[in-house]
Amino acid sequence: INPLFKDIKEYNKYLLSLIGIFVLLLSGIISYNYTNTSYAKWSSSVESKNIIKIHIKTGKSALEFAQAKVGTDGLEQITHTIDDTLQVDSKFATEYRYRGGNVNNYVTFNNETWRIIGIIPTEDTDGNVENRTKIIRDTSVGDMYWDGNGSNNWTTATLNTYLNNDYYNTLSSDAKNMIGTTKYYLGGYNSNASFTSDVMWQYERKNEANRTGYYYRTNPIMQNDANKKIAIMYASDYGYAASKKCTSSLYYYYDDTNCKKTNNWLDKSAGTWLLPQYSGDYDVTFSVNLIGGVDPNYKVYVSGENAVRPVLSLSSNVKISSGNGTSEQPYQLSIS
């Protein structure tokens, strides 16, 4: 028996521990780093300077999950056309989004029911681009103004401030630790949404050299603030949530059964704020209307409020560890 151990029982426990670790390593459930700079207790009486640091692997990365699930549960691959008029490059060309009315994208976040919009290439505030899971709260946190001062500049909007201060502070510490920083694109347009989701996706991301028609005067083209991680959905997020059979422009979603209600999981039959600005005036933004279409909303401040559904992107180290995405067994998240 090794003299470091008091008796045969302790030695056997040590051997069994090593065998267990070896099996887990072979199965890929854990990984390890070897070091001789720290102490670890193998038993109540034995210390060793040479230790193995164990890292438990749980779940799949966002991209691994998407590639395994694409074509099932309503998850579909979308490919964008990228050109030099946009703030994004070829790394953003491929997304995976949940589409239609019959989707299994329920996820538990902050001990609440949220939904997965998709696995989307996302740029953080340091300029890193990774495939990350974008989620939206299943229900509204209430009806509010987009901006209490009557401006369609999202960086200074009162709703933006509320979401990243008052609302953020209601989240659990676990939930806060799962949220990654995100660059938000603030482009819009200067007429009714008589264009498709693909076109709107590009409008939302127009760069500074091509800002005319997509931003009101000097409104910023994006928000790159590490302290503002939470926003609301893009018009294109709502558009892509419709069935693949939906070919209508966003404005006419209300008139196409393939685009709304039972064929669009984001349609709640409620006026709901969207992120894009209406670039033709200072106090107008886009929203989903009561009948499922998307149009400029003049209620940004003057005459009313709309539902608010917080949206955020999880950090890249957050993985889906269990569940099947149904409302009965929503996906569960873990940090690796």
Each predicted region: which residue ranges?
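N-terminal Lys/Arg-rich, disordered targeting/topogenic segments
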Residues: 1-11
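Long, domain-scale functional regions
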Residues: 59-336
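N-terminal start-of-chain detector that recognizes signal peptides
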Residues: 12-13, 26-27, 88, 282-283
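A broad, low-specificity signal for short, low-complexity segments enriched in glycine/proline
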Residues: 11-12, 16-23, 71-79
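Low-complexity, intrinsically disordered/propeptide-like segments
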Residues: 7, 21, 25-27, 189, ...
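Short, polar/proline-rich extracytoplasmic segments that appear immediately after membrane translocation
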Residues: 14, 20-61, 324
